[in-house]
């Protein structure tokens, strides 16, 4: 556990249409039922300021570096105003997306982008990384079918299968790079409840 906090920081990662937000909500409700102090938040967003930045990030076509800096600025506000205070009070913080999403969605568009994103994060908040990250592993073909069946509401939803594959393999690479922190939950053929039960086993 990181030394600046007393609580526990849990993040959910993966591409579009993989059930990540559903699992974040299910874990939040489970911990609430156990009378555990817990908050649920998301990125990009989580605070009034960061949510305004989110609107630009997910709807406007930005230059790659501008998009990365927008995401990092939103994260700094989110961490400073919400995540860190909650952790210091002993809460479990569940976050729907965090640093790995920035790596895969913004970092891949830049030269040496993976290292750049992690180094920027360390500069902004050197002691704050998740205690555990769940990568919800759903094959790109399955994920894009799910997205196509719902109302697509941002620029990432409407990108094609090549984009979905690129994002998917980025998350797989990161899960292999950080196996102690990032737990892969293979979810393509599982129900939401079955995925939830697998996640609970890691807590």
UniProtKB/Swiss-Prot annotation:
Binding of ATP, residues: 14-21
EC class of the enzyme, as a word: transferase
InterPro entries: P-loop_NTPase, Thymidylate_kin-like_dom, Thymidylate_kin_CS, Thymidylate_kinase
One Pfam family cited in the UniProt record for this chain: Thymidylate_kin
Enzyme Commission number: 2.7.4.9
GO MF annotation terms: ATP binding; dTMP kinase activity
Coiled coil: none
Role played: Phosphorylation of dTMP to form dTDP in both de novo and salvage pathways of dTTP synthesis.
NCBIfam families, sorted: DTMP_kinase (TIGR00041)
Family indicated by similarity: Belongs to the thymidylate kinase family.
Protein name per the record: Thymidylate kinase
Species assigned in the record: Rickettsia conorii (strain ATCC VR-613 / Malish 7)
């Amino acid at each position: 556990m990181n030394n600046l906090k007393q609580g526990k920081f849990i993040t959910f990662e993966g591409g579009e249409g993989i059930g990540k937000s559903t699992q974040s909500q299910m874990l939040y409700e489970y911990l609430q039922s156990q009378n555990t102090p817990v908050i649920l938040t998301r990125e990009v967003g989580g605070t009034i300021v960061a949510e305004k930045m989110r609107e630009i990030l997910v709807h406007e076509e930005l230059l790659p570096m501008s998009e990365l800096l927008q995401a990092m600025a939103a994260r700094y506000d989110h961490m400073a105003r919400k995540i860190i205070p909650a952790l210091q009070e002993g809460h479990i913080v569940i976050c729907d997306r965090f640093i790995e999403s920035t790596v895969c969605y913004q970092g891949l568009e830049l030269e040496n982008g993976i290292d750049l994103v992690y180094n920027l994060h360390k500069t902004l908040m050197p002691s704050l990384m998740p205690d555990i990250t769940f990568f919800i592993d759903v094959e790109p073909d399955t994920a894009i079918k799910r997205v196509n069946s719902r109302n697509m509401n941002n620029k990432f939803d409407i990108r094609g299968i090549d984009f979905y594959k690129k994002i998917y393999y980025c998350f797989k690479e990161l899960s292999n790079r950080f196996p102690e922190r990032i737990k892969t939950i293979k979810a393509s053929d599982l129900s939401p409840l079955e995925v939830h039960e697998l996640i609970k086993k890691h807590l």
